[in-house]
């Protein structure tokens, strides 16, 4: 990643908290309904209830990718002791396709933050080939860097994040 201090992934500390610097080399398009995720986009939990549509660029169907979706701000940005929370894990996604053609290792769980503004990050890795990946025992305290090292994925080839916070009018005092 050519270091650009204005890059939203750096400004938001996604690079640092979740990822090491990397060079974007493939297109990653994540869409909830009609809303395409761009870095720093604000989405409400009600807008991310359903699994997003994910499209991956590339030119060679023989290349495979792994998509990781995490929230590094669980349970709250000021006390992220469960960092990172794994929301979704899909492997063996052929280039030029999307997650529907991959192998869902951990099913999609929609973000539902209870305190503060959470960053929800989609990270795409290029695989060396098809491989067997095991689901982690739990979603909390997932470590993207460690996962990439275990499965020899190297640095990411793309990433995008959105911000999500509790819906206003949820919870509170009841009489």
UniProtKB/Swiss-Prot annotation:
UniProt cross-references to CDD domains, sorted A to Z: PEBP_euk
GO biological-process terms attached to the record: cell differentiation; flower development; meristem determinacy; photoperiodism, flowering; positive regulation of flower development; regulation of flower development; regulation of stomatal movement
Induction: Levels follow a circadian cycle with a progressive accumulation during the day time. By light. Expression is delayed and reduced under SD conditions. Repressed by FLC. Up-Regulated by VOZ1 and/or VOZ2. Up-regulated by APL/FE. Down-regulated by the H3K36me2 modification at the FT locus produced by the interaction between EFM and JMJ30. Repressed by MYB56.
One Pfam short name: PBP
InterPro entries linked: PEBP, PEBP-like_sf, PEBP_euk, Phosphatidylethanolamine-bd_CS
Coiled-coil zones: none
Tissue expression: Mostly localized in leaves vasculature.
PROSITE patterns on file: PBP
Outcome when changing residue 171 to E: In ft-1; late-flowering
Main location (coarse class): cytoplasm
Keywords: Cytoplasm, Developmental protein, Differentiation, Endoplasmic reticulum, Flowering, Nucleus
Annotated GO CC locations: cytoplasm; endoplasmic reticulum; nucleus
Subcellular location: Cytoplasm; Nucleus; Endoplasmic reticulum
A single MF term (Gene Ontology): phosphatidylethanolamine binding
Subunit relationships: Interacts with FD/BZIP14 and FDP/BZIP27. Interacts with FTIP1/MCTP1 in phloem companion cells. Interacts with NAKR1.
Record family assignment: Belongs to the phosphatidylethanolamine-binding protein family.
Miscellaneous information on this protein: Mutagenesis of Tyr-85 to His converts the activator of flowering 'FLOWERING LOCUS T' into a 'TERMINAL FLOWER 1'-like repressor of flowering.
Job description of the protein: Component of the mobile flower-promoting signal (floral stimulus or florigen). Promotes the transition from vegetative growth to flowering. Required for 'SEPALLATA3' (SEP3) and 'FRUITFULL' (FUL) accumulation in mature rosette leaves. Seems to acts in parallel with 'LEAFY' to induce flowering by regulating 'APETALA1'. Translated in leaves and then transported to the shoot apical meristem where it activates the transcription of several floral meristem identity genes. May play a role in both the autonomous and the long-day flowering pathways.
Name this polypeptide is given: Protein FLOWERING LOCUS T
């Amino acid at each position: 990643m050519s270091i650009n201090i204005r890059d939203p992934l750096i400004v938001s500390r996604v690079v640092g908290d979740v990822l090491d610097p990397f060079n974007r080399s493939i297109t990653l398009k994540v869409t909830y309904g009609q809303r395409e995720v761009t870095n720093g986009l604000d989405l409400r939990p009600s807008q991310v209830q359903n699994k997003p549509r994910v499209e991956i660029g590339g030119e060679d169907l023989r290349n495979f990718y792994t998509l990781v979706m995490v929230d590094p701000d669980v349970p709250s940005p000021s006390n992220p002791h469960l960092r990172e929370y794994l929301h979704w894990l899909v492997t063996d996604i052929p280039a030029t396709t999307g997650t529907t053609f991959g192998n869902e290792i951990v099913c999609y769980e929609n973000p539902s933050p209870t305190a503060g503004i959470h960053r929800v990050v989609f990270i795409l890795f290029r695989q060396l080939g098809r491989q067997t990946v095991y689901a982690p025992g739990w979603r909390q305290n997932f470590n993207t860097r460690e996962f990439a090292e275990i499965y020899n994925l190297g640095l990411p080839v793309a990433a995008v994040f959105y911000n999500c916070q509790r819906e206003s009018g949820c919870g509170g005092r009841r009489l």
